[in-house]
């Protein structure tokens, strides 16, 4: 973007919109952010049972670090070092997230993170947030938007040099920007939805399960994931079909709720004293993947985050990839004085990789649902980690590349496929020898460290 002070309108004050406002303000621009919902820092902006906790990983951490927010955000997070898998028979299996000490995730409440980013952006000179403000229309040719109070009132027209659509998976900016263009758009709803539940602290104020981990209750017809919170509680997300014999619709009585949990998640049912009320009262959310192009129009309009590429939450990369959009857009606007060139470079740099992320997120849903509790899955993941320890410069598991590096998603998948081909070509025998050698080397290393103590 040119170095002169320009006016930017951001539509959407969620995670991506708030962070991109901060990045653009740091470039010296005047930024107005319009959001149809109330201020997320207010009680009205925090409805109960409507969010999935966030797993902050390397891409999101890099974006927050770029504006000096990472340290503050980490203070509001809980480290997740492992995935703890709960079986219906009561068995528990632990799967580390990485092979090195720093390769962990950080659990943070969505509303806390949004509040931190909004407050930081609002403190920048020239940044103004307009909550309870509904986008009425976009004129892509003139770079204007019409906005009106959600409670009713006078519509006003705002003109900007650049309009950023950060208004979510069902983006109005995207719809109006692409209207009449040779645009591609695909939307796919998962037959499953989600509902937020809680594992509170016990009577002594202590966590009921191990806190520094993501807890997973897999299942082919229903599964549950629990993120830790700083107060010792866990926020659970129950995933299952909207309709059918095993579905949210079928959990229509207290008895049905209790029987369902006792059969499928028996150890979890004991940890959730408010289970029946939460299942009965909390809303069911929808899960959608969105692919579209173009992401920009001329030098005036651009999409980021879910407005450009919504994905299922099962790889934990929705927020991280949206934050990465902010970094790449900032870099492209800095590198290219011509804004149209910058926006084209941004889309070219991001879209191939977010398309791959959509595929990875769908595949990880199937893993979490059907395979994560199987011994073969655990053995394969363990072999991957052992090879990474033995050959750190040459072997990186796919999950590690996605979560613990900023390697572009498509590049990470291509490298993982090459690694898989190597194992297949080497044959099962050589792979077993390699894993056994890696195990022996690791054990020897542990003995040496113990002797030094």
UniProtKB/Swiss-Prot annotation:
Pathway: Cofactor biosynthesis; NAD(+) biosynthesis; quinolinate from L-kynurenine: step 1/3. It catalyses: L-kynurenine + NADPH + O2 + H(+) = 3-hydroxy-L-kynurenine + NADP(+) + H2O. The keyword Flavoprotein applies. It comes from the Bacteria. One of its GO terms (biological process) is kynurenine metabolic process. Its cofactor is FAD. It is an enzyme of class 1 (oxidoreductase). SUPFAM superfamilies: FAD/NAD(P)-binding domain (SSF51905). Keywords: FAD, Flavoprotein, Monooxygenase, NADP, Oxidoreductase, Pyridine nucleotide biosynthesis. The keyword DNA repair does not apply. Signal peptide: none annotated. Pfam families: FAD_binding_3. One of its GO terms (molecular function) is FAD binding. Its EC number is 1.14.13.9. Catalyzes the hydroxylation of L-kynurenine (L-Kyn) to form 3-hydroxy-L-kynurenine (L-3OHKyn). Required for synthesis of quinolinic acid. Belongs to the aromatic-ring hydroxylase family. KMO subfamily. This is Kynurenine 3-monooxygenase. It comes from Salinispora tropica (strain ATCC BAA-916 / DSM 44818 / JCM 13857 / NBRC 105044 / CNB-440).
